[in-house]
Design a protein with these regions (language model features):
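Hydrophobic, well-ordered secondary-structure elements that form the walls
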Residues: 231, 257, 288
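A charged, aromatic-enriched C-terminal amphipathic alpha-helix characteristic of glycosyltransferases
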Residues: 278-309
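Generic C-terminal helix-cap and adjacent flexible tail
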Residues: 310-317
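Residue-level signal for the nucleotide or nucleotide-sugar donor/cofactor binding architecture
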Residues: 226, 262, 296
Length: 317
């Protein structure tokens, strides 16, 4: 398939600090001809000099903070091929981004949030829950010793930024864990600071491998980030807060992860149980790994997207 992939800010580079921004692009390149265009776009006339089968706007495109970048693109409709958008950064210019998708008559909305259905209805297009997954070449089982009971790496999202039952959740979990009962790896900093960042994906992935349990919680708008799948693919036990509506049945307590209540009322009990029941822990870890490796890698996401594009292009099939 010939794909025009439109992005911004060189976020598809392997050297970009968030590698998952470019994982779909790199996966699509393996079996398709992908033409990459980076930057704001006003018309398509000068960027497509060969037959294009579809257009994909990547995550980086929706990191732009100028509302003027979310206008109608001249010539896009005239290409008469399926157009897909990976909606991103919902806290910034969300309405402008939705209007961009609407006025450009996109065919497929890819949204990692539970809002994918309502956003698709507003735009008037197909919508797909498109999880931010992980690359099993990086996040994989390693033959390293488990030296931590529990690990975490990421921004704290404190200072009341998140409202409701998950308010200051990561800070609250940390305070609960620093009583000295367990050996923990906790690398975090306040919102807006990148001091917590581990220098390389390899080092970060190894820290997950070195931990028996890894904490991953929903983000500022109850979003599910790639850490969930990074942990599963690493064969470490995923510990996450209980959000059944947002999880849509994908993350199930005692099956492929362990969930705790947002008020932390059962956190100690669950940690004690699984840290002292290795057999039960390993069953969950194996279930999680098999689910992630078979359904939720970036290859799976790329295949899912290409199938949806073919459905849109040839609806009679």
């Amino acid at each position: 398939m010939n794909i025009l992939f439109i992005d911004y800010g060189n976020t598809v580079s392997k050297n970009y600090m968030y590698q998952y921004y470019g994982d779909l692009y790199r996966e699509l390149k393996k079996d398709n001809t992908v033409f990459l265009y980076q930057g704001p776009l006003r018309n398509t006339e000068n960027i497509s000099n060969s037959k294009i089968d579809c257009v994909i706007f990547g995550l980086g495109y929706f990191t732009q903070t100028d509302p003027e970048k979310y206008k109608e693109i001249k010539g896009l409709k005239d290409l008469k091929v399926p157009v897909a958008c990976m909606l991103h950064k919902h806290l910034s210019l969300l309405q402008q981004k939705l209007e961009f998708c609407k006025i450009n008559n996109i065919d497929i909305l890819l949204d990692s949030h539970i809002t994918y259905k309502e956003h698709g209805e507003y735009i008037g297009c197909e919508s797909v829950r498109f999880w931010f997954t992980a690359n099993p070449d990086i996040y994989r089982p390693r033959d390293v010793k488990k030296i931590y009971d529990i690990g975490f790496n990421g921004a704290s999202h404190g200072s009341g930024k998140i409202k409701g039952p998950t308010r200051d959740l990561r800070d609250r979990v940390h305070k609960k864990l620093i009583d000295g009962k367990r050996n923990i790896f906790w690398n975090s900093s306040k919102e807006g600071s990148l001091q917590y960042r581990i220098s390389s994906a390899e080092e970060y992935a190894t820290k997950i491998n070195q931990s028996k349990i890894w904490v991953s919680t929903t983000g500022p708008i109850l979003d599910v980030g790639p850490r969930y799948f990074e942990v599963m693919l690493s064969k470490t036990l995923l510990l996450c807060n209980n959000m059944p509506y947002e999880y849509e049945g994908i993350f199930q307590d005692g099956v492929n992860c362990v969930t705790f209540e947002n008020d932390l009322s059962d956190l100690d009990e669950k940690l004690d149980y699984y840290l002292n029941n290795e057999e039960e822990m390993n069953k969950i870890i194996e279930n999680a790994y098999q689910m992630a490796i078979n359904k939720y890698t970036w290859k799976n996401m790329a295949d899912k997207l290409l199938e949806k594009i073919e459905e849109v292009a040839c609806p009679s099939k």
